[in-house]
């Protein structure tokens, strides 16, 4: 199913210029992650982050998230890039940040992680399904357990929660309101109006 991407027209000293809405947002250092996370989506987000860093390494970037989650490896590629680049990245949950979406929400610069009042956040353990020979299934099971351990450690570090609590809470789907996510440490503030972006 394809969606029509709105175009916006801007007046410049050279006349009119039209942009698709995402390109126009990018001009204001805003990246919108509004879908499930797979390799294609991750590559687009990473490319935008690297482009904005090259444009101005000292100016904040805003990453808006409305995502049900997705691939762990794709999400971790975004996470590593968020930590790698020099600009502070502010994360803002609009709608839903679930699974890897919640993980990326927590990955923003501490003090600059937000959610709108009616946003919903959900954390849980990695899921995976594999078929084949028993030894291959065992290899994949070990890999998923290693990923689970790694994700839990990072989430504990990002939220300030004890690792034991993260392990318990992610054992099943754990839903939170925006306020509960603030108390948990996934975000720093529930906001109703835009925050002013700043230099570092």
Swiss-Prot record:
EC annotation from Swiss-Prot or TrEMBL: 3.4.21.92
Protease in keyword set: yes
CDD domains for the chain: S14_ClpP_2
InterPro entries registered for this protein in UniProt: ClpP, ClpP/crotonase-like_dom_sf, ClpP/TepA, ClpP_His_AS, ClpP_Ser_AS
Gene Ontology biological process: protein quality control for misfolded or incompletely synthesized proteins
Keywords of this entry: Cytoplasm, Hydrolase, Protease, Serine protease
GO MF: ATP-dependent peptidase activity; ATPase binding; serine-type endopeptidase activity
Location in or out of the cell: Cytoplasm
Highest taxon above the source species: Bacteria
UniProt enzyme class: hydrolase
Function: Cleaves peptides in various proteins in a process that requires ATP hydrolysis. Has a chymotrypsin-like activity. Plays a major role in the degradation of misfolded proteins.
UniProt name for this protein: ATP-dependent Clp protease proteolytic subunit
Gene: clpP
């Amino acid at each position: 199913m394809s969606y029509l991407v709105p175009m916006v027209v801007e007046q410049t000293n050279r006349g009119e210029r039209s942009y698709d809405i995402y390109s126009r947002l990018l001009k204001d250092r805003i990246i919108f992650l509004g879908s499930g996370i797979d390799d294609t989506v991750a590559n687009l987000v990473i490319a935008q982050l690297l482009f904005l860093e090259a444009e101005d390494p000292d100016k904040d970037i805003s990453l808006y998230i409305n995502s049900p989650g997705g691939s762990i490896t794709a999400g971790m590629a975004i996470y590593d890039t968020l930590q790698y680049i020099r600009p502070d990245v502010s994360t803002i949950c609009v709608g839903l940040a679930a699974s890897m979406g919640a993980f990326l929400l927590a990955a923003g610069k501490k003090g600059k992680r937000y959610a709108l009042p009616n946003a919903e956040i959900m954390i849980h353990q990695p899921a995976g399904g594999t078929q084949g020979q028993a030894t291959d299934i065992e290899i994949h099971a070990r890999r998923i357990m290693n990923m689970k351990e790694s994700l839990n450690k990072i989430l504990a570090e990002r939220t300030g929660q004890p690792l034991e609590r993260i392990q318990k809470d992610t054992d099943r789907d754990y839903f939170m309101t925006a306020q509960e996510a603030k108390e948990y440490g996934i975000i720093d503030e529930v906001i109703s109006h835009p925050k002013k972006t700043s230099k570092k």
